[in-house]
Amino acid sequence: MKILFCTDGSKISFNALKNIAYWIKQATIDTICVIDWNILPAEITIDEENFSFSCANVADTILDYAEEEIKNLGLQLGNRIKNCGSAIESILEQSEKEKYDLILMGSHGKKGIQKWLGSVSQEIINSSKISDYIAKKENNKKKVLFTTDGTECSLSVIGEIIS
């Protein structure tokens, strides 16, 4: 099973990883961090080269932390992916390009302003062609209620998780 773990460094994104770790020991987890500059007002001009460099540094710090968390949870570490730009577009493009089985993310990120502009996780749920796991808070329960639309994809993910 291939999982795309999406993180902006927020505690909630790492809660998603912790919540599902018990169920995905055999999965390979690729981690994507997208620094989304689309929230900047159009009136603000930036030096794109320096801003891209800063974005890359922030993404590297977040990805380093994510790698440690994945290792500490005893999970199989995959690739690191970093992008600057639209989080929604980057996540959807990556999930389709690499044919992941599951997108894993927190319900909302670090930026409170994004709640006003629209939720990345909500758009991923609505637009993704694969299964998604969205977490709100850490939960150490060993019971999970899976909902499915009956598609082969949904059933295969459940099969992978319970095997």
Map each language-model feature to its residues.
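Small/aliphatic-rich secondary-structure junction motif
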Residues: 1-49, 143-163
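A short acidic, glycine-rich active-site loop
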Residues: 49-61
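Gly/Ser-rich helix-loop-strand patches that form or flank binding pockets
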Residues: 92-140
